Design a protein with these regions (language model features):
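Short acidic, flexible loop segments centered on an aromatic residue
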Residues: 2-22
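Short, solvent-exposed loop/turn motifs
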Residues: 3, 33-34, 143
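Residues in well-ordered beta-strands of folded domains
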Residues: 7, 40, 138
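A short, sequence-level motif marking secondary-structure junctions
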Residues: 10-13, 42-43, 149-155
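Intrinsically disordered, low-complexity Pro/Gly/Ser/Thr-rich segments with frequent PxxP/GP/PP motifs
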Residues: 15-55
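Terminal connector regions
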Residues: 42-127, 135-137, 144-147
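Helix-biased "structured C-terminal domain" signature
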Residues: 131-178
Length: 178
């Protein structure tokens, strides 16, 4: 009996769903409510679910920061909660190529797995302050993420995910031009 916050760009993974999904917009779900959540597919070539007992789970990372920006832009300019699915698949394909990552299902999660040790090294350098509730993250001189939460406890949950999202894009130095 608590409200549930689902942040935009949360990666929802699992074999029970037909494809891995990314939440398109932040949703605060009231207690005991049933809500349709806008998502896009982050895995292009898997169209079937599995009878496996693996539960649906939330990834340790969010969708990469440049993708978060593009998704937000789609939603803002279309004045809806939906994003352009083909553009999301295209940017995932580009990201797989950029990191020379093979994925039968074209899953963005494979990139995070491939660079996990590099990304976790970056995550370890960020420790939240006692009462900190937000963070501004940049690549070079460009601000790419600004997130504020209602409590330090909530912030501590999301900080590593936000850093992973930004870290993935930081490996390509020309990705964000000043």
């Amino acid at each position: 009996n608590q409200k549930l916050l689902i942040l935009d760009s949360e990666n929802i993974l699992g074999t029970r769903i037909r494809q891995n999904r990314v939440v398109s917009t932040t949703v605060l779900i009231p207690e005991y409510a049933s809500v349709l959540i806008p998502v896009f597919c982050s895995e292009q070539n898997r169209w079937s679910s599995s009878l496996s007992q693996e539960d649906i789970k939330v990834s340790e990372s969010l969708y990469f920061s440049k993708g978060r920006e593009n998704n937000f832009s789609d939603i803002y300019h279309s004045n809806s909660k939906q994003t352009n699915q083909h553009e999301r698949w295209s940017e995932i394909s580009d990201k797989l190529d950029e990191f020379k990552t093979k994925s039968f299902t074209s899953s963005v999660e494979e990139i995070y797995k491939k660079r996990k040790s590099n990304i976790e090294e970056i995550v370890r350098n960020f420790q939240p302050e006692k009462n900190q509730v937000g963070v501004a993250l940049g690549i070079g001189s460009r601000l790419v993420s600004l997130d504020i939460f209602s409590s330090n406890e909530m912030f501590k949950i999301y900080l590593p995910r936000l850093i992973r999202s930004t870290a993935l894009d930081s490996f390509k130095k020309t990705y964000y031009k000043s």
